[in-house]
Every structure is written in structure tokens, then in C-alpha cells.
Amino acid sequence: MTNSIEVINLSKSYKSKQAVNNINFKINENEIVGLLGPNGCGKTTTIGMMLGLLKPTSGKVLINGKDIEKNKISLLHKMNFISPYIELPKKLTVRQNLVVYGKLYNVSNLQKQIDYLSIKLRLEKLLDNVTGELSSGQKNRVSLAKALINNPTVLLLDEPTASLDPET
């Protein structure tokens, strides 16, 4: 079986509001797919259901053929995501943030991974700064490093370029 994400007849309602209505798509390994649409059309809700953070009203999400609702723990260790709605701990340094997330994912070569990501994302001069003192764009680069720390097989991005400069 190839690695894939399959969204099947996925819907989500909040009381009387239909946030996502019966969507279907498949993303195969090494594909990059964007969900496009106006504000409030259900993109973030769809990502939440794909991660197993929100329960669909109907339909399902399969990750490599496994239902996310029934296999959250095993599947979430292979996934990661970025969202501008999730705050970084403000009193931790950039390095401490990356160490915490690396340990959560049992990254074996953690210091090497931190060094690599800090260079790639231009964070090396910020590693000892507390995240509460960073600009929005710098925080987004830390969030990206955090999301890549475990080399996820699935990376879901919700508004990943918000506040980033063109070089990033």
C-alpha cells in the first residue's frame, strides 16, 4: 500500500451551521495539495478532522488506509501540523521549544536535527531568545522547525506563510 491520505464523504456541522459538506479527495505520497477558499469555508475544520482533533459529523479520514478516529495514537506520531492559532510557550527559548518537541517525539539525533533546522530556517542566532520576544514571522519559523523536528511523513499546514518574509 502506498502512503496516502484519503478524505471520504467528510462533513462537519456545528449546531445549524454546515462547516464542511461531503468532501472527498486523496493525497498520495510526495504530493503537495492546497485547500483554497474564502475565510470561513471550512479549511481549518477539514485539517482538524484530518488530524483527528475534530470528530466529523459524517465520513472518515484514512491515513495509509487506517481510520484516524480509530488509530489516533499510532498515526499522530507520524504526523505534524502548523497553525497560526497555536501559541508557542512564551517563556521558553527557541532551543528549549525544539528540545521539548523533540523529546515528545523521541527524536534520537535531536541536537543534530536542531542544528540542521536552525540553519535551514535561519534560527541559529535566535536559539537562545525566548519566543515571547520574537516577531510573528520568527515565531512562525520556530513553529515550522517544531513541526519538522520528528521528520513527519504527513505535514499539514494551516496558513503556513502568514507573517513570513519572502526568503523563508
PLM features per residue range, with description:
Residues 155-158:
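Catalytic Walker B motif of ABC-type/P-loop ATPase nucleotide-binding domains
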Residues 59-70, 75:
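Conserved ABC transporter NBD signature motif
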Residues 151:
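Conserved catalytic motifs of ABC-family nucleotide-binding domains
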Residues 99, 103-126:
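Conserved ABC ATPase "signature" region
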Residues 166-168:
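Helix N-cap at the start of a conserved alpha-helix in ABC-type nucleotide-binding domains
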Residues 130-134:
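Conserved ABC ATPase signature
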